[in-house]
Swiss-Prot record:
Protein name: Large ribosomal subunit protein bL31
Annotated GO CC locations: ribonucleoprotein complex; ribosome
Similarity comment: family membership: Belongs to the bacterial ribosomal protein bL31 family. Type A subfamily.
Family matches, as Gene3D superfamilies: Ribosomal protein L31 (4.10.830.30)
Lineage of the species this protein comes from: Bacteria, Pseudomonadati, Myxococcota, Polyangia, Polyangiales
Gene: rpmE
Positions bound to Zn(2+): 16, 18, 36, 39
GO terms assigned for molecular function: metal ion binding; rRNA binding; structural constituent of ribosome
PANTHER family registered for this protein in UniProt: 50S RIBOSOMAL PROTEIN L31, CHLOROPLASTIC, LARGE RIBOSOMAL SUBUNIT PROTEIN BL31A
Keywords: Metal-binding, Ribonucleoprotein, Ribosomal protein, RNA-binding, rRNA-binding, Zinc
GO biological process, one term: translation
Length: 68
């Protein structure tokens, strides 16, 4: 590697909106994020099921005559 052309690689703290803190190394430094593996629904298993039955019925009613 050439000396003097690479960015400084230093300790970094990543803080999530939920309060989780991750210590790592980065060229960016410390920063915050909105979601992490501690609070993201995919990792926590707390998926939200949306009720879209009304929308589906409205779509079918609107385009019922288009296929005939």
């Amino acid at each position: 590697m050439k000396p003097g052309i690479h960015p400084e690689y230093k300790a970094s703290t990543i803080t999530c909106a939920c309060g989780a803190v991750v210590e790592t190394r980065s060229t960016r430094g410390s920063f915050t994020t909105d979601v992490c593996s501690a609070c993201h629904p995919f990792y926590t298993g707390k998926h939200k099921i949306m009720d879209v039955a009304g929308r589906v019925d409205r779509f079918r009613k609107k385009y019922a005559t288009a296929g005939k």
